[in-house]
């Protein structure tokens, strides 16, 4: 989901275009519906995204539905958070983060 976050279809159909053309960091949560840690992290990611409405774009990519994106970005474990800035991957963190660690990560790039 891209919610400033965009709609699911748009993020998946236009992922590369959105990442490359964004003038602000893009924070992507690669996840799957069956993943317990992903379910625990989802509300943290969603709530934290509301704190940065114009400073970062937040996206969720379901690696089950979008296997091509998961493969392209070499997602080996989930959840994996990938930060893109100026169209390039600048940081990657695997595993669920607590709210403070997530905010610290975001603040590194805004």
Give residue ranges: language-model regions.
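A short beta-strand-turn-helix
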Residues: 8-25
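Conserved redox-active cysteine motifs that mediate thiol-disulfide chemistry
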Residues: 30-44
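Conserved helix-turn-beta segment immediately C-terminal to the redox Cys motif
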Residues: 23-25, 42-61
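Structural microenvironment flanking redox-active thiols in thiol-disulfide oxidoreductases
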Residues: 61-71
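Non-catalytic, surface beta->alpha helical segment in thiol-disulfide oxidoreductase systems
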Residues: 77, 82-110
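Short pre-active-site segment immediately N-terminal to redox-active cysteine/selenocysteine motifs
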Residues: 23-26, 31-34, 77
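N-terminal targeting signals for export/organelle localization
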Residues: 1-7
